[in-house]
Curated annotation (Swiss-Prot):
The keyword Cell division applies. Residues 509-520, 527-544, 665-679, 702-718, 726-749, 776-790, 826-844 have a biased composition (Polar residues). It holds the Pfam family MAP10_N. This is Microtubule-associated protein 10.
Amino acid sequence: MATTAAGRLFSLELLVDWVRLETGLSPCAASPAVAFRLLDFPPLLVFPPAAPGPEPQRGAISFGRGKACLLRLHPAALRRPRLRAALLQLPVGPTSAPGLVGACDILLVPSLGQRGVFALRGPEAERVGELALFYRLTELGRFSPGVPQLRGPLSPACILDSEALEVSEPRTEETSKPCTKGISARCLQCVSNARLLEGSEPCAKDTNSWSAGDSDASVVQKSWEEAVLHSKASSGDMASAPCSPAPSGKTVSSVSQDVTELDFETNTFCPPPLYYTHLTQEKTPSARVEITIEPQRNEPEDLDDIFPETKLVSPPLRPVKHTRAAVQESPPVLPNLPQTQGPGEANEAPCPPQIEQSPVNAIRQLPLLNALLIELSLLCNQPVASPTQVHPHLAWLYRGEDKGPDPSTKSTSPSESKSNKLSVRENEKLVNPQSKKNPKGKHPKIGGSPPPKVTKGRLLYGLTNTLRLRLQQTNPNMLVVHEKREQYRRSQIQAVGPKLRIPSWKGKVSSSAAESQMSPQLPADTPTDSNGKLPSLAVQSQLPPQLPGDESLDSIGSFEEGSDTSMQIRAGFDESSTTKEVKQSHAMKQEMVDQSENRTIVTALRAPVSPAGSVTPERSLRSNSFGGNWKNKVPSPGLSLQEPTVDKTVDEGKDGRQVKAISAADTSENRPTSRKSSCESISELLYRDGFTSPCYSEDFCTTENNSRSLPAPDSSTGVEHVQKGSRASKSSEARLSTRKNSSDSSSVLTPPFSAGSPVCSHKRSRALKIHDSLEEASSLSTSDFSSQWTNEKENQADPGSSKVMRKGRDSSTKLKVRAGHKSSEKSQSPRTSQVSSYEPSNLSELELKAIDDSDLADFQEEEDGLGSLRISRQCKDICELVINKLPGYTV
């Protein structure tokens, strides 16, 4: 049945359970064997076990063994798939031929398997015994085209020669050849210990049917000898060995190697090595190794770069590496380990280099994880060398690393440079407030390197980092202006020199009071003082006679306080003006010193000489308001610029409470200046005087200031000190101390900007208006005075006067605020009066704005030499609006 046509693969499984002979026949003296022959394939021999098992039946020989082989059959061969099974009696000697005991034919049909007992018939067709056999013929599909075609009958099936999974004896050379010959055969080894077996013997090729009637001994012996040659050597049961017919044994041996390789490749089950941590390199597919090695070729250099840095800088990455080591430790990585191990890595951790290196390789092959680690290293300012593989979407993470020489500084270099510049400026400006707050000879250090730390932990609302950064982005020009102000403030601090420390609220009050008092009396005492401020102060001091003596003194004190207050307001809006009045004596003394020190400021004020009457009346009004209820407001044209707040009428203090109403003229004046000079003056003062959030917030919202402002009016002694001339020194000292103290005491206070919120101010103004209508009337009168004072100021048009007026406005504003802070009623009443005065005096205020804008701009340009500082006028204008329009707030 040889054919070259492509056949189909079949699996034949045979299991002999037992063989029983008839009673008349004695068991085979020699070892019995069952031979199966199918078509022209070599016979399959099944031998009983060496140690016979229990007999299933009386007189039965227990086998319990079988064979299994793969066959390639042409479809035509399936027309009569008969299996011949024969019971043979093996000869005792090697020379004697085996004897045939009985045989039977079994019809093979591809099926799931059948079990049956078949009758064995002897040569004469007599019944000689029974064969219990299980057989199964399974079609496996078309034969693989890759299997080489063999010469001759290519359909001989493998003869499985050994039993049970063990081969007790080595195979002979003859046996080995047929075994390798099983080209297409795959040994599906049958379970050996199955008890139910069936057997069959293939029909001899020469005889179409090998029936019991065939008594040709030669044929039987021939096929039997062939079977013995293949299987006698093996006493095992199930070891499979492909066998070929004797005629083609040599030809098959030439192809045996190819078949063996095919068997190994196709029959080897290799589970994915990914699921196993301890795989040997031999089991790793070559393709897999190549894929893994590709990305790792350039890694050793990178690893050397990465790990020294990571090792030294970011130890947290080590546990990550160790945890990944077990996962990544795989044969693909092992070949590269000796190369990839970096010098720094060996010292990095006790882990062996393989364990250490494998996680690195794993990370490199995981772009997202690698990017995450690099991003973390960047956040820690510890950049890692650029990895070999960078995900295209993550390339931006690695750009900054290659730029700088030092990986730790690469990521932060741009931001640090900016922040360093800002911090240097900021520190310098922070030093200025400190020097003012710490006047004890510390100001000389301002020009030096920034202080290592801010000692008192104050919030210095100078040019803060936040403000600097914000201005840098939004308004660079304004940033330049602020920096100039910082420099100017620094120079003023140096000029002021050491100053006396006063309690925060006392210092603030005294500084403001001293400034307000000192401004009028200094001119009186020292009208020819080198400071340009003195003439205007003299004019202002001349005004007090117009008012009652007490009033004039109070007004002078309030005026000096207003001038100092204006500086304080610029510095930080120290305590309420009344508090300043209470401590006018100290402030006046300080202001005397300050005048000598701050000659530049005084000189700027000195040039303009305004009618003393207008300025003094307002100050006297303030002092009188402290002493009693005053509705009279005297405009101070001479001090108009410096004392817009002084011009603001001091509303009648209800129940002896000082009610300070900032005149609408002052408000309007402050407003025109506000857009240019008001911002400049306020910002200058704030930055220049070491403005601190506490002081600023105190002026706006501190209740302490209110309580302090109550005693503040009792500053008649302050007025006297102003007359003595020590007011200047005290006022300057009080300013500095007030700034420091106010910052300390009012550190809890709300920020200045929040205090100036229009909503809250409107609410307060309404409540204050409702609370005190009399104060509103007084404020109206004050607004009239302020308008008159504005007209006088216009006539004067003196830049020094404008500066003095700004100071006066600031001081008066502070006085108002303090009076309002002393008591809610007081605060309400002055604020209400401020609002009322502001409303009626809108025209005058507008005029004042125009005048103040021109005068203050000129004055600040002369005094500070900073024409760009006119922006402070805007701030001033806003402050004026807040103070006057919104009585609840003071600037």
